[in-house]
């Protein structure tokens, strides 16, 4: 994790630093090597939050789009269950950044636990996922819905099935890639998968600029597809 508690408040890992886990209040070890990003870890292989995944630079870069106070916030349910949200805004919206594979059971558990949440998925993890997604636009056209938003529909085979059952908005980050089927500068957009298919069972997508995405997230709660059309 990025932050630990100390006498100075929340601090990032530095060599020989001491910290306390904000979730379980146990001592943390500052991991400051050369192979991985500097982070805090529990002793041994223990981790108090089983939803937590090892962070990559991709995680850190996304978190840093938002204020430090919003990053790694402990979310407590009515029954006392606790988990660390990647980002939680003052309006109560949780953003989870997912790089590694995730089971359907865990995905649904997180959506039920956080309630008001969205996903940002690292689409670059498997190269074939982007190739399949990119190819689907060979014969499709984006429709304009305002200055920053475009809408489209593609067959279900175009995106990983593991995310098509989500009840929340899923934003795919394909990185700053180039595509012969996308118009100029669209490689900087996020592609949002809506929870609802159209009347023919096709997936519905929204393309939104990164800056506009962070602005909407920062000012919204209970974000849904209607929030993206203004």
Predicted regions and their residues:
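Nuclease-adjacent, charged terminal/linker segments that flank catalytic cores
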Residues: 1-71, 77, 214, 219-230
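Non-catalytic C-terminal interaction segments of nucleic acid-processing enzymes
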Residues: 2-9, 13-16, 124-230
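Short, conserved loop/helix-junction motifs that constitute active-site signature segments
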Residues: 111-114
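Short hydrophobic alpha-helical runs that function as membrane-insertion/retention elements
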Residues: 116-121
């Amino acid at each position: 994790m990025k932050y630990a508690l100390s006498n100075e408040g929340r601090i990032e890992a530095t060599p020989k630093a001491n910290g306390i886990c904000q979730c379980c209040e146990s001592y943390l070890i500052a991991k400051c090597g050369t192979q991985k990003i500097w982070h805090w870890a529990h002793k041994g292989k223990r981790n108090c939050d089983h939803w937590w995944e090892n962070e990559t630079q991709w995680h850190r870069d996304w978190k840093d789009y938002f204020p430090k106070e919003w990053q790694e916030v402990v979310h407590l349910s009515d029954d006392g269950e606790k988990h660390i949200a990647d980002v939680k805004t003052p309006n109560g919206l949780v953003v989870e950044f997912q790089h590694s594979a995730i089971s359907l059971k865990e995905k649904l558990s997180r959506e039920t636990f956080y309630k008001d949440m969205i996903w940002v998925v690292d689409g670059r993890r498997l190269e074939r996922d982007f190739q399949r997604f990119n190819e689907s636009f060979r014969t499709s056209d984006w429709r304009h819905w305002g200055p920053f938003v475009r809408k489209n529909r593609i067959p279900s085979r175009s995106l990983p099935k593991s995310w098509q059952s989500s009840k929340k908005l899923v934003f795919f980050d394909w990185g700053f890639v180039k595509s012969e089927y996308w118009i100029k500068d669209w490689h900087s957009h996020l592609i949002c998968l809506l929870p609802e298919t159209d009347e023919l069972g096709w997936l519905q997508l929204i393309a939104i600029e990164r800056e506009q995405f962070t602005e909407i997230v920062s000012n919204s709660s209970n974000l849904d597809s209607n929030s993206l059309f203004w």
